[in-house]
Amino acid sequence: MTTPTNYIATWFYKESKEDASFYPQAGKRGDSALVHSIYMQIQVPFFTTFRHYHPDDKLLFFSNLDQFPDYLERLFKELRIETVTLPYLCIPPKGWYGAWRNQFYLYDILRYMEKRMQADDTLLICDADCLCMRPLEQLFSDTRKYGSALYDASDRPDLSVNGITLKEMTDIYNDCYVEKEKREKEKEATKKTEAEKEEAEQQDTKNGVTRTELVHYYGGEFISLRGDVVARINEAYPTLWNYNLERFAANQPKLNEEAHFLSVVATRLNIHNNIANQYVKRLWTYPKYNTVEKGDEQLAVWHLPYEKKRGLYLLYKHFVNHPTFDDEEAFRKKASAYTGVPTVTFGKRIRDFITILLLKIKDKCIYLSLIHI
């Protein structure tokens, strides 16, 4: 019997000038040289930490690029990272949404992995602005047992998340799956005999019942799926995608990003859990918005969206020429000091100020060099 494989993957899609969207944490468009360098650099602490705690699992990096900076090429070779060059076929049309137009690349990855995975394999797709701080064997065990481990981030149902609320997501779910099915059944009913109509009315129409409970918002930064569930999501994707395109054409509220899609598809497939919440948390360390609580430092994975140009950049500098560590406690202290988990110290604020200043100077130099070419 073949031993199931645990896959751990992250990705980067480089946008062209024509299809570039805005990246809020970087403060630039996706075709910016600064954005490109930031997302290349954070791969270093990501893969260094995930490989340390998972020496035997399969680590993958997906991109539309086939060449990378020399330091990344060396890292991939040393840490045994497989790179997969994948085109972006699930790209939404122009004018879709202001930010993160690259996010639907996730579904190209799922299509690819369906062909590669066995039913009992597991796949963790994780954003690259994450650090792995503990082994994830139990996560993979949970995924294998329950089919998925999702990060439920729907603690504020009234909040607009990337342009849409949970109430609007629920309305879209009902209109796509319930009202659309009703309309189709009404069309079919005109073609049926009286006996067929009576039989249809007696059938259990569970999926045709309007949903009143709000759809849960499952974050796209940390998704763990079993192989057979990957296949189910891929099968369900086209119906929702085509419906969403109809709403876009009609200028109606739509599902703007990959996590919106995941949330509605998961609801459709009756996949409901918050298993990943015990392993990961979105840890905002922004001075005006800090979500870090005491005890968060014990999580297996830290998701650090604000630290791309700060703590994660410093960890890139630390690991770039030597992507390994032996003393886990010493690394935890360094990661804590650089990222502000669990406490943003005065020393971190000073380091952040200097780091951002240097990055601004670097970005300005790149801009000046380009306009003189």
Segments predicted by a language model, with ranges:
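Short, solvent-exposed loop/turn segments at secondary-structure junctions
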Residues: F12-K17, L65-F68, I91, C130-C132, ...
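A short, glycine-/small-residue-rich helix N-cap motif at loop->alpha-helix starts
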Residues: Y97-L106
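GT-A fold catalytic core of metal-dependent nucleotide-sugar glycosyltransferases
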Residues: Y107-L159
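A short, conserved beta-to-alpha structural element at the edge of catalytic cores
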Residues: A149-V178
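Catalytic core and acceptor-binding pocket of nucleotide-sugar-dependent glycosyltransferases
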Residues: E181-K191, E196, E201-P305
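Long, low-complexity C-terminal extensions of enzymes
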Residues: Y289-L370
